[in-house]
Amino acid sequence: AQGPHRDQFVERFHREARSAAAIANPHIVQVYDTGEFDGLDYLVMEYVHGVNLRYEMNQQGTFSVRETLRIIGETLDGLASAHRAGVVHRDIKPENILLNDRGHVQITDFGLAKTVSQATLSSTGILLGTAAYLAPEMIEKNQATPQGDLYSVGIMAWEMLAGNVPFTSDNPVTLVFKHVHEDVPSIATACKGINEGVAAFLAHLTARAVEARPADASVALTELQRLQSTLAVSDWQYRLPPVDVSASDSAAPANNGAPTNVGNPVPPAPPAPPTQQFDDRTRKLDRVKTNATTVMPVQQQN
């Protein structure tokens, strides 16, 4: 890491290692070690063979309720372990949700994570995270909370079902203004006929007031499991016909450099007891073990 913000970058880098290493969960990319060699900071972490959720979104356009809730459920399971350890991710977005070659979620990039007890980072003057998924309290007060992670998860689920995020703008200032001053519209406005319970669950995650959301990911996961037990087959199968991929690509937030292994995407496995075969049209990834290690040198982004 070089440049005027080197010390701040290095601190964030080592914080990522400490945060991720403290959490043991199959839905979080495992960090094994960190250090410095010849002036180069490095991170030793689990190698995940697969794609990120953004890649899968670009391929599919929209997701069924079944696919969406399974991915969201595994994301909440990983975040529940983080929240129990006192760690908030701060930057949940599709680029940071990896789908391994079995189709399961592994959350990555805890570089923006911070323990709840740490001082706010507002003094740095840097707005961390991605505007399309930022919770109102992060924008207004740089306040990192478990509920902020849930807001981001809810926006991500909204995008998976509808094919686009609820708030869009070419101007990031306008975008964050909407998150602070407008309620996230019901997913039912974009997905006519979707189950009312699914819409209510997303509304709970994306409530504008932090106290109106579930207390943490564990509470949200319990709520999701209750919802899943009430869904009929037709509710699970609901899917909005995907829009033209070339048009949706321009509206979706760009991949900001999160690690991605480019290959054919892997559709998620069904969450409910009735099983179904994976769709062969997208399952052609070469198989490698995901418990291999990767030594990743880290350079400061300019």
Identify the role of each PLM range.
Residues 211-293:
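Juxtacatalytic C-terminal regulatory tail of Ser/Thr protein kinases
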Residues 75-87:
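Protein kinase catalytic-loop region centered on the HRD/HxD motif
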Residues 71-72:
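Activation segment signature within eukaryotic-like protein kinase domains
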Residues 34:
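Activation-segment/catalytic-loop signature of the eukaryotic protein kinase fold
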Residues 132-235:
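C-terminal lobe helix-coil module of Hanks-type protein kinase domains
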Residues 38-52, 56:
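Conserved short submotifs of the Hanks-type protein kinase catalytic core
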Residues 1-22:
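AlphaC helix of the eukaryotic protein kinase fold
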